[in-house]
């Protein structure tokens, strides 16, 4: 029995499902999860000492690779000064200034500890600002596990939403309307029916939790125009795509300004940190200035802020995003070419340092299209690549991530492994 198996069996005795986040359990792909012992650059090593090329990077934060020496140094410098204070620090101001500089639509920002906290707080703020209750979200977009966001569409376009998780009361879910991603007609119909009841529309401008699906410019511009017309707050959930698709996030890529933005992952440099921010007039409704309550004991934790601030400084290096985007595109295009050579139906896409792999004829534009991919073939591919020492997301519904440490040699090794994996799939 491998060390991974031993640890997984042991974990299941004291941790529900043996993991602290469901996707880690390998339920989607089968098999035994890899327990990570250490990581460096583009690699990690599991409990059995096997090395893997890592294309998850903690689900996005590790944009400069694992244990970057400058991030490590920044963290080590603050450790001796204290782990947590529950009081303001100068470093909180510095990271807020950096975020506001890099994302111009964010005039003020509040630090929190997780993406779920960021989206949950942004929705409460939007409701407090507008005095409205209805929320609009989109099928396939994941915004954390707050009750009002664990909702799926009802039986008709304009019906009440239904909970997607046990424990979410229908009375909460009914305030959330779920529409199809990238469907402008459905969006216009919803705003025509109840636009003046909508407190906020929350969207991943580049979705990463139904695999990688890009928002179309037409869709995102329609969102911006309709929210402005009806006085609804447009919330871009950039917890995943923020500082991944461009230095200023998806807003910089598309040239669209949100009213509120949720950030996470990269801004913590691998530490538990997230944030929400936006227009000054909206943020002024937060306590202690306004009546919308939000708080957190560990918000702005000095260690997390140190890691995040150094990461934000590193990604501003000249040519950083050009090189990272080119490497990610080389990976995606190379995988598609290897599949094509083997005669395996497959598509790949990339934007910035995110990529998507689909066992389908073309790149999907909605959750419904993603579900038509060959999941069984993806699962086989995942395990073939895992055996080769390449670690992709253990689910056909998750995006992948490249770091600045994924150099040509790493990409070449990945494509060579993929060539063998696709040949096995085609056999």
From Swiss-Prot:
Enzyme Commission number, as recorded: 5.4.3.8
Keywords: Cytoplasm, Isomerase, Porphyrin biosynthesis, Pyridoxal phosphate
Main localization, broad class: cytoplasm
Modified sites of kind N6-(pyridoxal phosphate)lysine: 265
CC terms in the record's Gene Ontology section: cytoplasm
Keyword field contains Oxidoreductase: no
Cofactor(s) for this UniProt protein: pyridoxal 5'-phosphate
Recorded metabolic or biological pathway in which this protein acts: Porphyrin-containing compound metabolism; protoporphyrin-IX biosynthesis; 5-aminolevulinate from L-glutamyl-tRNA(Glu): step 2/2
Cited Gene3D superfamilies: Aspartate Aminotransferase, domain 1, Type I PLP-dependent aspartate aminotransferase-like (Major domain)
Subcellular location: Cytoplasm
Top-rank lineage group of the source organism: Bacteria
Reaction(s) the record says it catalyses: (S)-4-amino-5-oxopentanoate = 5-aminolevulinate
GO molecular function, one term: pyridoxal phosphate binding
Cross-referenced PROSITE patterns: AA_TRANSFER_CLASS_3
Keyword Nucleotide-binding: no
Similarity annotation: Belongs to the class-III pyridoxal-phosphate-dependent aminotransferase family. HemL subfamily.
NCBIfam families, sorted: hemL, PRK00062.1
Subunit structure: Homodimer.
Protein name: Glutamate-1-semialdehyde 2,1-aminomutase
Biological source species: Burkholderia multivorans (strain ATCC 17616 / 249)
């Amino acid at each position: 029995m491998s060390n991974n198996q031993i640890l997984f069996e042991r974990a299941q005795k004291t941790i529900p499902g043996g993991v602290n986040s469901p996707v880690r359990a390998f339920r989607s792909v089968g098999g035994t999860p890899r327990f990570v012992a250490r990581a460096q650059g583009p690699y990690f090593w599991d409990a059995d000492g096997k090395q893997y090329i890592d294309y998850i990077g903690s689900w996005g934060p590790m944009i400069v690779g694992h244990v970057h020496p400058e991030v490590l140094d920044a963290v080590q410098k603050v450790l001796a000064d204290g782990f947590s204070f529950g009081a303001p620090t100068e470093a909180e101001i510095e990271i807020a200034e950096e975020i506001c500089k890099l994302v111009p639509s964010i005039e003020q920002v509040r630090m929190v500890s997780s993406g779920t906290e960021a989206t949950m707080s942004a929705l409460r703020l939007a409701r407090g600002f507008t005095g409205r209750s209805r929320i609009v979200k989109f099928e396939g977009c994941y915004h954390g596990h707050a009750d009002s966001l664990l909702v799926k569409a009802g039986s008709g376009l304009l019906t009440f939403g239904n909970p997607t998780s046990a424990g979410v009361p229908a009375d909460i879910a009914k305030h959330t309307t779920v529409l199809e991603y990238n469907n402008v007609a459905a969006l216009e119909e919803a705003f025509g029916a109840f636009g003046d009841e909508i407190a906020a529309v929350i969207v991943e401008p580049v979705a990463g939790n139904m695999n990688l699906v890009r928002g179309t410019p037409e869709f995102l511009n329609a969102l911006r125009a309709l929210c402005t017309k009806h006085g609804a707050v447009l919330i871009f959930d950039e917890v995943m795509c923020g500082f991944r698709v461009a230095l200023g996030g998806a807003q910089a890529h598309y040239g669209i300004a949100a009213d509120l933005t949720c950030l996470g992952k990269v801004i913590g440099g691998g530490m538990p940190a997230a944030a929400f921010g936006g227009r000054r007039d909206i943020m002024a409704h937060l306590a202690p200035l306004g009546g919308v309550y939000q708080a957190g004991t560990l918000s702005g934790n000095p260690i997390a802020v140190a890691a995040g601030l150094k990461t934000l400084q590193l990604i501003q290096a000249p040519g950083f995003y050009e090189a990272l985007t080119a490497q990610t595109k080389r990976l995606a295009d190379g995988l598609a070419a290897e599949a094509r050579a083997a005669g395996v139906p497959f598509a790949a896409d990339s934007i910035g340092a995110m990529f998507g792999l689909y066992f389908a004829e073309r790149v999907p534009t909605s959750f419904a299209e993603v579900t038509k991919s060959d999941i069984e073939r993806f699962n086989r591919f995942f395990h073939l690549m895992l055996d080769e020492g390449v670690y992709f997301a253990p689910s056909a519904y998750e995006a992948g991530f490249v770091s600045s440490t994924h150099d040509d040699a790493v990409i070449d090794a990945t494509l060579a492994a993929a060539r063998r994996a696709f040949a096995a799939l085609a056999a």
